[in-house]
Each structure stands twice: as C-alpha cells, then as structure tokens.
Amino acid sequence: MSVHLTEGRRIIQYTGFDDIDEEDVEPNEEAEGPGGVHKKRRGARKKNRRQRMEGLENVDQTVDLQLVTVPKVVPFRASRLLQEIYDRERVHGMRRDEARQLLEDKLLFLEEKSLENLHLRRFCLVVPSDEHFQLDDGSKIPSEIVSISMENGKISSILRVFPSKTRSFEMESVENFQSHRMRRVYWNPSIPKDSNSMFRTWNHFLDGCLLSLLLVPLNKLTQVLEFLRKINEMRTVINNRITVSICLSRVICVEDYLSAVQKVMNTRTVQLDHIPSMDLPSLHFALDFSRYHIQSMNTIFTGSTEMDKLSDENSSHELVEFSSWSCHREAHINMEPEKYHRILHWLWDLSPVNPVDEAE
C-alpha cells in the first residue's frame, strides 16, 4: 500500500506487498512522478523469490544426477580381469577342477546343521536325450530333456521337455510314473513365445536346488552345456538383448559333486555303486542315475556317522570336525588373489558372518 499526494488530492495505490525492500524498487523512467519519485514495480519480490527457488531446484537436480551417475564401489566389479572371468564362466561354463574346488569352498561356508542334512536337500538332475531335433537354422538340440528333482532322500517329481514343429507350447496334466509325479511339456522352437514359456517352466522346476547347482552325468555334460548355450542364443535373438537364461557355471557333473562332498565331510574313500548303463532310454537312465546319486549320498553320510562313533570310542583317533572359516582361510593362503576374491564374492550370501571383515 502506498500513498501519493498530487495537487492537493490523496491517491492511494495498491502494490500488493506491505514489506517491499529497497532492492525491490526499480526505476522507471517513463513513469516518473512529481518530485522525482519513482513508482515501485509490482511483483518484483515475487520474481526474485521465484528465481531463488528455481536456482535451488537446479542445484537439487544436479546433485541427484551426480548421485545417480556415481557407481557404487564394489571391489569385485572394480577389477576388469575378474569381471571377464565371471562373464566367461557364466557363458562358457567352468572347468571341472575349478567347479569342484568352488563347490568345496561353498560347502565349507555352510553351517554344521546344513552339512549334516546335506543329503536331504533339494537336488535336480538334468539328462538330455541322445536323439536330436533339427532347428530352422540347421543346428540341433536334444529331442528330449529329462529333469528329475530329489528331496528328502527320494525322487519327488519328473519334468520331460519335448521340442516339436507341429505342436505349440502345451503342458500336459500330471501323470503317475513309477509312483512319481511326471509332466510332459511341448514347445515349438520357431515360436518366440513358446521358447520363453518353456524356459520359464523349466527354470521354475529347477529353482530351489542346493547352491543353485544342476547335476549332470559326466557323459552328458557336453550335451547339456551346448543345449544351454543354444537356449541363451535363442532368447537373446527373441528379446533383442544379451540374455543369459541359465548360467553355465551352475552345471556340475555328479561324479565331481560326490567327490567334493566326500572331501568336505572328511570321510574315507567310499566305494560307491556302479554307474547306471547308458543303453537305457533317457527317462529310465535318468531315474537310475537319480537313485545312484541318492544311494551314494546316503553311503557318504553313513560313513561319516560311523567315523564319528569310532572317534568317540577311541580317544586316540582325531575327532571329525566341520571346517570353519579359519581353516578355509589357511587352506587358501597361497591362492591367487583374483581367484580368492572371486570366491569371496560368490560366497558372500552363504557365510553366517561377513568373510571380508574376518579376512582383514
């Protein structure tokens, strides 16, 4: 509110603000009144306030962008060599000796109760057929993939996947085969939707396995790895991006798995049953191999229990103790730093405590 006196008359003008500062008064040459009094421009204070608020918003946006662009410091990803090793093993698989050593390290990080009930955990065995199915591009994949899940020391369910050129994706109803739940799945590899549906169904069946491992017979290892690579390539083309459907580093042969378990459990060399014959059809061979794996695990843990009893009766024998983190650290004191940190990264979630803190 402002008051001006002009030729004996009082003129009241409303400016909108009662607390206008001197900095808000701007000269106006054209609107200069009597006595050289400059009129005050309306809205100047609001304009200055708006400019200050916009400046703060720009600063906040700049800070937000900086927070988004600054990557989180992860020791594993900071090394280009380790990242290349991880990508290679994920896409091309691991060597047998590395897979066996890594499995031993993972088992060492499990708690004592988990090791005692290791043979009762969930396992999945994957067996491809020797017959082939030709794709549109001329490449070949197995005509059947048999997956068997084992839990609580027995076979729980069976999933059979068949590629077909005449039938689209279809899941048949559950049937009973030798007192086991079995389901057949058909899919057309030339249809993108079928490939994604088949993979989701198969991946859901393989979910929940111990350490996310896929057990494969040694004589079928190459076929399974080639099939997984082909599935990865097909889904990469379908999704128009690099897609790793199932990491090949999850695959390990049953013989190496049993050998690693024997070493971790500190049992004597156990004479396992004979491996099933290869002359059987894929389904029967997979069932026999699953029973072979269950019996072998029971034999290993039975031998471990007997050794514990002998140790209690005879004090001269050393007690069988589960390896702790200190034993794991001493066993890998001469390991290459890259491989050692890679193992720590993979076993981060398995350790009951933070392994990096103890290592320091």
Swiss-Prot record:
Highest classification ranks of the organism: Eukaryota, Metazoa, Ecdysozoa, Nematoda, Chromadorea
Residue ranges, compositional bias (Acidic residues): 22-32
Name of the protein: Uncharacterized protein ZK1128.3
Domain of life: Eukaryota
Compositional bias segments (type: Basic residues): 37-50
Native source organism of the sequence: Caenorhabditis elegans
Region (Disordered): 22-55
